[in-house]
Regions:
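Extended, low-hydrophobicity segments enriched in charged/polar residues
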Residues: 2-191, 201
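Histidine (H) residue identity feature
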Residues: 66, 105, 143, 193, ...
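C-terminal structured interaction module
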Residues: 260-277
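Long, positively charged binding patches that form subdomain-scale interaction surfaces
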Residues: 154-263
Length: 277
């Protein structure tokens, strides 16, 4: 079952102005501009750009990942692309790995697939026996119980370039700072929400990251089936990580239906990999 709605369209000028104003409250240096998209193949992506017929999709959710009755659920994002009229597309985003493709392991998935040329640049990260992070190529065209995917024709067009340096505010997450900047400065009301997606690099500095361990290694109850959400921490954290990281992000300021779509509560999903190793 697929439920659909439309996000409100704002001009790139309004979006960039909102980001410039809002992000300046959290970072020492902020430069937001509208530019021609660089050739993303130079960034190791399987497509040149991220423009044309843009759609985002929120697949599954926490119950499909953590409810014992639903663990192991898998979704074919190539089949989903056909259902939404994006079968010839570049798909990027963040999700969980399909356990059937990982010998039963859990994994954090960077979705990076060209469904036009069949090129795959996806990466999976999982927790090893000694709690080390293992990152490797992933070529399956399906993901696990949740995924946030951006579908586009993959052509080059105008994009918003954001350059930031030096955090001065309390918000530690760039994507959450972006969501707040958009909400505050676009003065969103009446469910006139906006969604953005794209690729960014961490050139300097380090970040805190996590990978979901295998279910058998989580020794406590962390999911409440009545609330249909996780109520205790269960992730394996790694810090500091970086720099030279490439991130793939889908974010939105809210549900354009007012809540009927039951979108991911965080309002964003971002996964990354090293671009030098």
């Amino acid at each position: 079952k697929i439920e659909k709605s439309k996000f409100k369209e704002y001009s790139l000028d309004r979006i960039s102005d909102a980001l410039q104003s809002g992000l300046s409250n959290n970072y020492k240096l902020v430069e937001v501009s509208i530019v021609d998209c660089p050739n993303l193949r130079d960034w190791g992506c399987p497509s040149e750009g991220i423009s044309g017929n843009q759609k985002i999709i929120d697949v599954g959710g926490e119950p499909y990942m953590h409810d014992p009755k639903l663990i192991g659920a898998e979704f074919d994002y190539e089949e989903i692309s056909k259902m939404i009229g994006s079968e010839k597309s570049y798909a990027l985003g963040a999700g969980s790995g399909a356990m059937s493709c990982l010998d039963g392991h859990c994994g954090e998935l960077v979705i990076n697939e060209n469904l036009i040329t069949d090129e795959s640049k996806s990466i999976i990260a999982r927790v090893g026996k000694n709690k080390e992070c293992i990152a490797e190529k992933y070529t399956a065209r399906k993901h696990g119980g949740l995924g946030n995917v951006f579908y586009t024709d993959g052509v080059r067009g105008k994009v918003i370039k954001i350059k930031i340096k030096g955090r001065s505010g309390e918000q530690g997450s760039l994507t959450q700072a972006m969501r707040k900047a958009l909400s505050d400065n676009l003065k969103i009301k009446d469910n006139g929400h906006i969604a953005l997606a794209g690729v960014f690099r961490i050139l300097n500095g380090k970040i805190r990251s996590h990978v979901q361990p295998d279910y058998k290694d989580i020794k406590h109850e962390y999911y409440d089936p009545e609330q249909m959400k996780c109520v205790k921490d269960f992730l394996q954290f790694y810090e500091p990580v970086g720099p030279e990281l490439q991130s793939y992000c889908v974010l939105w300021t809210g549900d354009p239906t007012g809540g009927n779509l039951n979108l991911r509560e965080s309002g964003e999903h971002t996964h990354f990999h090293s671009y030098t190793k």
